[in-house]
Amino acid sequence: SLSFYKPILYKREKQKKHYGNDSRIIGWQLDNEPAVQFDYNPKAELAFRDFLREKYHHDIKALNDAWGTAFWSEVYSSFDEITLPKTAQMFMNHHQILDYRRFAASQTNDFLNEQCLLIKKYAKNQWVTTNYIPNYEEGHIGGSPALDFQSYTRYMVYGDNEGIGRRGYRVGNPLRIAFANDFFRPIQGTYGVMELQPGQVNWGSINPQPLPGAVRLWMWSVFAGG
């Protein structure tokens, strides 16, 4: 929510002033598994309109053409007429939904960038990253260029699939790490894994115990990916 934006940055600044030159700290992980959160309050609606004005260069005709609003008489005469895509009697304009998702992703990216730049203001020798969940359909991953490198989170066995092989239920599917490596490596070259399952979890409906040596195997798979 935009309502929390400034208070969080204020607290971040106080924190970085205190720890920015602490030699015991080598780097920072921003938040935990940042994701795109859909916000429908009035401030978000105003910000969405500003996002559209910038994207379409203040040309409402360009937006109408891109969204295909001539169909079903959706034509807008002003950006101020545009609302957030909430619900409709039959269906929503898919172009509007796509732009809203892009807007929400940009809000997440901007927030990460702001935090990162704030850290670097006081911590010249400390790197900054964050740990994304490798959801390949998400549009915000890799969209914060201020980060020094991108990182991901990976849980391999929590009862959601049988894995591969006779012991796969306790070792997992190696493609989960391989795909994540290949997804994150091209963004900046260097990538990290800030959260890798060390044992049983407390949130799985079925909770297999990783086989002895499984965590080491996963770590080697991360290193092998570059």
Model-predicted segments: where are they?
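Active-site core of glycosidic bond-cleaving carbohydrate-active enzymes
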Residues: S151-T153, N173-W203
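Substrate-binding cleft of secreted/luminal carbohydrate-active enzymes
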Residues: I26, L196, I206, P210-G226
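Anion (oxyanion) recognition and catalysis
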Residues: K120, R185, F223-A224
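Polysaccharide-binding and catalytic clefts of secreted carbohydrate-active enzymes
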Residues: S1-F179
